Curated annotation (Swiss-Prot):
This protein is involved in the repair of mismatches in DNA. It is possible that it carries out the mismatch recognition step. This protein has a weak ATPase activity. This is DNA mismatch repair protein MutS. ATP binds at G626, P627, N628, M629, A630, G631, K632, S633. It comes from Treponema pallidum (strain Nichols). GO terms for molecular function: ATP binding; ATP-dependent DNA damage sensor activity; damaged DNA binding; mismatched DNA binding.
Length: 900
């Protein structure tokens, strides 16, 4: 290998190319390897676990060309960019091979499956600003989806934070000037440490430059049709994205055919804290989609549908008309389960048409991509047959005008592409026999050459007398003759030895070399012609890019709507009814996720009625008290989720739900330290609370849990009451406010309702009923919950003593519930060990609604038999017998009175 000293021509070439791409890892092609040098080698070898070597003091590492895609994908997941530098001239001895970067791959510019996550969008976003307006735009090059919005400069900080949280781009393209003019942007970006940031030259955002790029991309001189506002940052934002992507992909973006303009107020505003607390797309435990709302709703069968479902969950609708359009389609499928079943089976045959079409347009599609497109077209064409039984809702199936074109494309791909074609185009074997007469002729020549090789082998067998003489082929030697060790003495002089093995030797001859050269020329001609035909087929498909993208979008929407219908059938959900009186009425509401992970029938449904109207007799503020573990947080979250699910356009987990669309959903439930930003739990809690008080409107839904818990009791109580009063008197939003500050129960207002989570106390046992009823709860039963958590009995006893002392100092007698707790500690021999928690949800409502037998049954259901001793079990049985005898006596007495 030539010297790698920095003054060699090769290294000068490397450094010159590297300087053009300072923010990317340069994959520098050297023969069958991509090499990395200097700082790239040091960094990548550590990141990917590659072997680091040195040549003439220069650090280097490399990966084979055939495994490079795997390593590039790993780098992208680490948030890196890769500049792919290829050899663009044939190597000539003594001359430096020409090289250039043919593509820049980054999380926001990737288009090939190896570099993408199925079901996830990977957007490239940008921000541009003028003195009065800020534009936010994002584009997914792998599908062609392109969006833009703008807002007044004064609203930029809040609006940008919401949009970055909602869109969650993979990469952001910014100019240095916008970072200077929007100092708040740096703080927003710091919230997303994994977001790849690319700094573009200010010239990239120049209005004239971007306008020309847009004219070229959309093939129009009139940009009004693109919904871009003249004399605004819109042009710079949209044009910069197009320009940057054309530079990185080294190809026109013919599949990007429209820009969707939206207004941020078209959708329900959900901030990052609320999105996290409601576990909409990922859970709080390990940040996966397990046990999330997304998992509960996701019965999609296509990658396109999965991405659209994520988008819809990030963008709940505010328009009743738009929500109703979706609901009408869900109702259609919900009421026709036989059609739904057939539709779901057909959708399972549809591949990722959006990304397939993008690769076709960017000339990156291979034979198997076109086969996947063919199978998808076949499935899409069968959708129309489902309409024979019942007309589908509009805009979900291919139009009658599109059908002939789709059939024509399907026919072209069916006739042309071989089912077993390879991924690599240079391997050939792409096109079916019979598609092209010229190609068939080349096949005939190649096949004849094979016959000639067979004839030559027969002649050599006869000439040498070696009946076991074989002809084989590999990439290293080409065609060769193989002679076993036992026949080497019969090898003639014109055999030229190529390789010796343990059991055979390999030879060639001048005649075989000539025949092989003829075969190679025929094969090269055939592969070259196949590639030309394939390129023609791909161009034909590309000419219908817009039609294919339109129908792919319809399929994605169809997939999500059928997913909603299937979820409703699976989970027993009902159709929400939208009203305009500002009310929220939920009957038998359930938590969509918690319910599914409990045994069937165990979740306790609850009702709720709220209104934001000033003149309504209905409450708009519900103050909720109840013990720990009683189900307050579940009730709070399920209310928010029911509203969100309804405004996405789905059925909801309730017997009945009537609601007026909300404009914002806030959910402040729990908090944690933000150590990286130097913020304590209480500061995080207060920051979230302040945001809600500033941003909530009368049309919002506010969920707040345990405000003020992170500081001293007096401070926390004061803050909780002040926040409650502000929400009630000034914000006037529909509010659920859960608290352990039972002193707040004295609050009164015509539109304030006190709700509590019921608790059943029987002798020495406490059962959390999970049922929401009017009234206030006098205790949090903290010591009882501490017992369930397994605190030592001595600690529990001491806690009861201290509780009594604290209450006596406060000048009040211990509450009845506190006495029960102390009594429970004192009677440890008569009570089972509460080390194992009761079932999280039990189907019980209130003590006065149950017979003694049912109450005992509830207590038995809450027991963990592995956690009680035989003596404790006998004690329990004795108590139950006494209770049953007492119950029988009461019933007998009641019967006697009635007869009398």
């Amino acid at each position: 290998m030539r010297s790698l000293a920095s003054d060699t021509p090769l290294m000068r070439q490397y450094h010159a190319i590297r300087a053009q791409h300072p923010d990317a890892v340069l994959f520098f092609r050297l023969g069958d390897f991509y090499e990395m040098f200097d700082s790239d080698a040091l960094h990548v070898s550590t990141l990917l676990g590659l072997t680091l070597t040195k040549r003439n003091g220069t650090p280097m590492c490399g990966v084979p060309v055939h495994t490079a895609r795997t390593h590039i994908a790993r780098l992208l997941k680490h948030g890196k960019k890769v500049a792919l530098c290829e050899q663009v001239s044939h190597p000539v001895p003594g001359e430096l091979t020409q090289r250039k970067v043919i593509e820049i791959i980054s999380p926001g510019t990737a288009v090939e499956d190896d570099f993408l996550s199925q079901g996830f969008s990977q957007y490239l976003a940008t921000v541009c600003a003028s003195d009065a307006t800020v534009a936010f735009s994002y584009l997914e090059v792998s599908t062609g989806a392109f969006f833009i919005t703008s807002f007044p400069r004064a609203e930029a900080a809040d609006a940008l934070q919401k949009e970055f949280g909602r869109v969650q781009p993979s990469e952001v393209l910014l100019s240095a000037s916008v970072l200077r003019s929007l100092p708040e942007l740096a703080a927003i970006l710091s919230l997303y440490p994994r977001l790849v940031r690319t700094t573009g030259a200010d010239a990239l955002f120049n209005p004239e430059h971007t306008k020309n790029r847009l004219h070229h991309c959309f093939r129009t001189r009139n940009l009004d049709c693109l919904t871009l506002l003249p004399h605004s940052p819109d042009l710079a934002a949209a044009g910069a994205l197009i320009a940057y992507l054309e530079e990185t992909t080294r190809h026109p973006l013919s599949h990007v055919s429209a820009i969707t303009r939206y207004h941020i107020h078209d959708f329900v505003e959900i901030d990052d804290a609320t999105r996290k607390n409601l576990e909409i797309l990922q859970n709080l435990h390990d940040s996966t989609h397990a046990h999330s709302l997304f998992e509960t709703l996701n019965y999609t069968h296509t990658a396109m549908g999965t991405r659209l479902l994520r988008y819809w969950l990030h963008h709940p609708l505010r328009s009743q008309e738009e929500i109703q359009k979706r609901l009408s389609a869900v109702v259609f499928f919900h009421h026709r389960p036989h059609i739904l079943k057939t539709l779901r089976a057909t959708l399972s045959c549809v591949r990722d048409v959006e990304r397939l079409v993008a690769r076709v347009a960017l000339e990156k599609a291979h034979g198997r991509d076109l086969l996947a497109l063919k199978e998808s077209l076949r499935a899409i064409l069968t959708f129309r047959s489902l309409e024979r039984e019942s007309p589908f809702p509009p805009d979900l199936l291919p139009s009658e005008g599109d059908t002939p074109v789709l059939q024509e494309l399907y026919g072209l791909l069916e006739q042309s592409i071989k089912e077993d074609c390879p991924v690599t185009l240079s391997d050939g074997n792409l096109i079916k026999r019979g598609f092209s007469a010229s190609l068939d002729e080349l096949h005939r020549v190649r096949d004849n050459a094979n016959e000639i090789l067979k004839q030559y082998l027969a002649e050599e067998r006869e000439r040498t007398g070696i009946g076991t003489l074989k002809m084989k082929y590999n990439r290293m030697l080409g065609h060769f003759l193989e002679v076993s060790k036992g026949h080497l003495s019969a090898v003639p002089a014109h055999f030229i030895r190529r390789r010796s093995l343990s059991n055979a030797d390999r030879f060639t001859t001048e005649q075989l070399s000539e025949l092989e050269a003829k075969l190679a020329r025929a094969r090269e001609g055939l592969v070259s012609f196949e590639q030309e035909l394939f390129a023609d087929i791909r161009r034909t498909v590309c000419s219908h890019t817009q039609l294919l993208r339109t129908n792919a979008a319809r399929v994605a929407q169809l997939d999500v709507l059928q997913s909603f219908a299937h979820a409703a059938l699976q989970h027993g959900w009902s159709q929400p009814v939208f009203i305009k009186d500002g009310a929220l009425r939920i009957t038998g509401g359930r938590h969509p996720v918690v319910e599914l992970h409990l045994p069937s029938g165990e979740f306790v449904p609850n009702d709720l009625t709220l209104s934001s109207s000033e003149h309504a007799v209905l409450p708009r503020f519900a103050l909720i008290t109840g013990p720990n573990m009683a189900g307050k947080s579940t009730f709070l979250r399920q209310t928010a989720l029911i509203c969100l699910i309804a405004q996405v356009g789905s059925f909801v987990p309730a017997e009945k739900a009537e609601l007026t669309p909300v404009d914002r959903i806030f959910c402040r439930v729990g908090a944690a330290d933000n150590l990286a930003r130097g913020e304590s739990t209480f500061l995080v809690e207060m920051s979230e609370t302040a945001h809600i008080l500033r941003a909530a409107t009368r049309d919002s839904l506010v969920i707040m849990d345990e405000v003020g818990r992170g500081t001293a009791t007096e401070d926390g109580l004061s803050i909780a009451q002040a926040v409650s009063e502000y929400l009630l008197h000034h914000v006037r939003a529909k509010t659920l406010f859960a608290t352990h500050y039972h002193e707040l129960s004295r609050l009164a207002h015509p539109q304030l309702e006190h709700l509590k989570l019921d608790v059943l106390e029987t002798d020495n046992t406490i059962v959390f009923l999970k049922k929401v009823t009017p009234g206030s709860c006098g205790s949090s039963y903290g010591i009882y919950v501490a017992r369930l958590a397994g605190l030592p009995e001595s600690v529990l006893a001491r806690a009861c003593e201290l509780l009594k002392q604290l209450q006596q100092r406060a000048g009040s007698a211990p509450r009845a519930s506190a006495a029960h707790e102390a009594d429970a500690v004192a009677q440890t021999e008569a009570v089972h060990a509460h080390k194992a928690a009761s079932k999280p949800c039990a189907q019980r409502v209130s003590a006065d609604l149950f017979t003694q037998e049912e109450l005992i049954g509830a207590e038995i259901a809450s027991l963990n038999p592995d956690a009680i001793t035989p003596l404790e079990a006998l004690t329990l049985i004795a108590r139950w017998k006494r209770s049953l005898r007492g119950s029988a006596t009461q019933q007998s007495s009641a019967m006697t009175k009635r007869k009398g």
